[in-house]
Design a protein with these regions (language model features):
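C-terminal segment of classical bacterial N-terminal signal peptides
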Residues: 13-19
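Bacterial N-terminal signal peptides
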Residues: 7-12
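C-terminal and inter-domain tail/linker signature
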Residues: 19-146
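Bacterial N-terminal signal peptides that target proteins for export
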Residues: 1-5
Length: 146
């Protein structure tokens, strides 16, 4: 009986691990395509209509909740001539994703290191947080930002 319980527990762990990997891989594909459309092609409208739910939760205090509010806030910055958004890495684990990038919405500024954090549900982005660190003119260490 003890062996049967142990075997069942092992099968459960293996299945659970495979499901988590499967979720991560599905979400990685979504986030990679979202990043391509949003940051590389700078097509805010298409990226958000394809991958973001209408009642999107926004934690950036400068942007209201909702997909349309995000489109309205981001589209002018992403369509500005000389704006630059260079994705450095994408990290996905289960339902969470981080896109780490260099962003410069206004070409007259030095830009910032940005970490956009997304939560996904059923293959769609449902929630967003962001962290911005302005690019310094001087650094206390020799390490680059990226």
């Amino acid at each position: 009986m003890r062996r049967l319980v142990t075997a069942a527990a092992i099968v459960g762990l293996v299945t659970s691990g495979a499901q988590a990997r499967s979720l991560t891989e599905r979400n990685r594909a979504v986030v990679q395509d979202f990043a391509r459309i949003f940051y590389a092609e700078r097509d805010v409208e298409q990226a958000f209509r394809k991958y973001v739910v209408p009642d999107y939760i926004q934690h950036n205090p400068g942007i209201a909740d909702g997909r349309q509010a995000a489109i309205d806030a981001l589209k002018p910055m992403f369509s500005r001539p000389g704006a630059q958004f260079d994705v450095k890495r994408i990290i996905v684990d289960g339902d969470l994703a981080v896109i780490h990038l260099f962003g410069r919405g206004d070409p007259s500024t030095p830009g910032a290191a940005v970490a956009d954090i997304y939560r996904l549900k059923d293959g769609k982005i449902v929630e967003h947080w962001d962290i911005l660190q302005p690019m310094p003119t001087q650094s206390a260490n020799p390490h680059p930002m990226f």
